[in-house]
Amino acid sequence: GQEALSKAGVDSNPAVRYIDLEGRTVVPGFNDNHVHALILGDHRSVPSLAGLDAEKIVYAVTKHYPAPKPGELLLAYEWDYPACPNPHRKILDDAFPDNPVVLVQFSGHGVWVNTKTLEAMGIDQSAPADSASSAGNHTAPEDPLVRDEEGNATGIIRDSSSNSLLMEHFKKVHRNPALARERLETALREFRERGITSFQDNTWFFPAILGYRRLKRHGRLTARVSCWLFGNDPKRSALMNLPLYGGNLLTRGPWKFILDGSFSAHTGWLCEPYANDPGNYGRGVPASHIEGYLEFLLKKNRQGAFHAIGDRAVKEFLDAAEKVAGKNPRLKDFRLRIEHAQLIRKEDIKRIRDLNILVAAQPSALATPDKDRE
């Protein structure tokens, strides 16, 4: 207490400021090891649909967009299957016949859209010629659309990156410096309120780096940011690899690679098929690609973070890492990360340890397992 401060000479330093917390607790700032800051800011600009059923979702979207212009995109986030188990485009068609609607599922790896959106994407919602292979309220692995028993699109798209309207929205936000800065400041404010003083950010887009630089220049960057590059798109990441960083507030983080999808979208890569989706093992990346990613990291001398949710995705990553490390043991010193790792085979736990790999799991996956369907 006071004796320790006195011995250290702190109490005699005129620059020291004393604050009486009146018995409250002080803890070090938290580090969040996996965020999407700009997208979080975007979430807060539109309705949250978390925990809402279909009727309440329609009400929330209508309230936020009371008089939309014809053709204006209606966007919202975080609906989930426990509260809304049977989403369908017709529900949105009835409520919003003149506007494309994009509702992002809580995992971020799936979207619920209406017919206007499908039309804007150039997708025919009727049954394709080979609909038999993708019917039954499920989808063939190569088809991002979930279809009903007749093969018609239900309005669920399994991979959000397959939604061109959503991707165009993100590009619009990134291209507008003021809008991007506002989204980042919203996220930073939320981090401050929760005691987060540093975070690992899936930055991905070059303009977001410029947004952070502006905030830093004006003294408004209130947390240390590690900016992750998007390894699946080398051209995009080449820009982010420029010397844009510096100091301890804004640093260049690992390269991020995506190896599968999510359980709730039935795109997480599994060793066995989904219990209620026969024949669907999810989606993954060829082993040769994973090995190429690892060789690339060795060449760049950079850490890598690999999105792998399903047990097959984790297994394939470990297979590739063992193969590459066998040729170049230096790979074990890179502290490679497996992001999420929601399902791991028991025999792979030792392999993770032997390869000196970090598992970056998120508590939310444990706290809300009911949101990840069978």
Regions found by a protein language model. Name each.
Residues 36, 249-267, 356-366:
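Non-cysteine beta-strand/loop elements that form the S-adenosyl-L-methionine
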Residues 115, 209-213, 314-323, 350, ...:
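Histidine/acidic-residue-rich catalytic or RNA/ligand-binding cores of hydrolases
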Residues 220-255, 335-342, 346, 372-374:
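Phosphate/diphosphate-binding loops
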Residues 288-292, 315, 319, 336, ...:
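Feature representing long, continuous alpha-helical segments
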Residues 322, 326, 345:
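N-terminal active-site wall of soluble small-molecule enzyme domains
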Residues 343-374:
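Active-site-adjacent C-terminal substructures of enzyme catalytic domains
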